[in-house]
């Protein structure tokens, strides 16, 4: 299709009046400022969580404990066909369809591993700052299925599971723990069995300190979730205003 000068002159285009454009521009500028502030709040809260975890892991009550004393492999297959979830660095355990728009699982997922709420999942998949894979607690309210390549573990308590989750949120902690256990295979693949994952030590505070940590970190995490929700709302508002400029 070729459009020439006369054709373009006859083309009717709808756009907001100058006053409306100025109003939308002003609102967009205000929302951009708010998004920037909100992003900074979220980054600061994430740094706070990291700082709290590092401080607790160096508490005077800490003792070094084999992970095998805190976790046991679940070994439950997906015979009930629970929905397939992935594991994300930033979002934790996520529903593939809800977050990725589609499922990347096999047609038959009965051989997938089941993770209960509170279980620890180890992905064995390198990503970003985590070259040996990521470790996350399943915070989804129901049982989920995950890749058969993942290790799934039941913790001796949910307080311990939460502590392990936040401990391994640190790229440095994850790398220091895992690099001694892993053998790199062909094409940089990670070779580690589910049991081998449990064969190193982590610092664990006493029960009183652990309970205090869980209460504090849970409160901060709940606040962080609200702040992220607000950021998503602001971003949605911005997208809406942008579309209105071209209605």
What are the roles of these predicted feature ranges?
Residues 23-35, 53-55, 213-224, 246:
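Hydrophobic structural patches
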Residues 1-19, 143-149, 183-208:
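A short glycine-rich beta-alpha junction/loop motif
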């Amino acid at each position: 299709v070729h459009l020439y000068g006369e054709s373009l002159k006859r083309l009717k285009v709808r756009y907001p009046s100058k006053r409306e454009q100025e109003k939308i521009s002003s609102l967009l500028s205000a929302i951009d400022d708010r998004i920037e502030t909100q992003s900074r709040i979220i980054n600061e809260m994430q740094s706070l969580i990291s700082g709290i975890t590092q401080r607790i892991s160096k508490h005077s009550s800490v003792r070094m404990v084999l992970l095998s004393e805190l976790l046991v492999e679940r070994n439950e297959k997906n015979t009930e066909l629970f929905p397939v979830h992935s594991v994300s660095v930033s979002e934790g355990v996520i529903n593939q369809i809800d977050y990725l728009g589609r499922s990347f699982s096999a047609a038959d997922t009965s051989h997938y591993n089941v993770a209960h709420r509170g279980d620890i999942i180890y992905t064995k998949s390198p990503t970003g700052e985590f070259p040996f894979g990521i470790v996350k607690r399943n915070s989804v309210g129901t049982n989920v299925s995950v890749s058969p390549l993942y290790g799934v573990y039941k913790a001796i308590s949910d307080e311990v599971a939460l502590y392990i989750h936040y401990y391994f949120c640190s790229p440095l902690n994850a790398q220091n723990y895992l690099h001694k256990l892993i053998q790199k295979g062909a094409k940089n693949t990670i070779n580690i069995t589910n049991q081998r994952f449990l064969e190193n030590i982590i610092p664990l505070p006493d029960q009183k300190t652990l309970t205090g940590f869980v209460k504090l970190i849970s409160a901060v995490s709940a606040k962080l979730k609200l702040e992220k929700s607000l950021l998503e709302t602001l971003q949605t508002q911005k997208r809406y205003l942008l579309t209105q400029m071209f209605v």
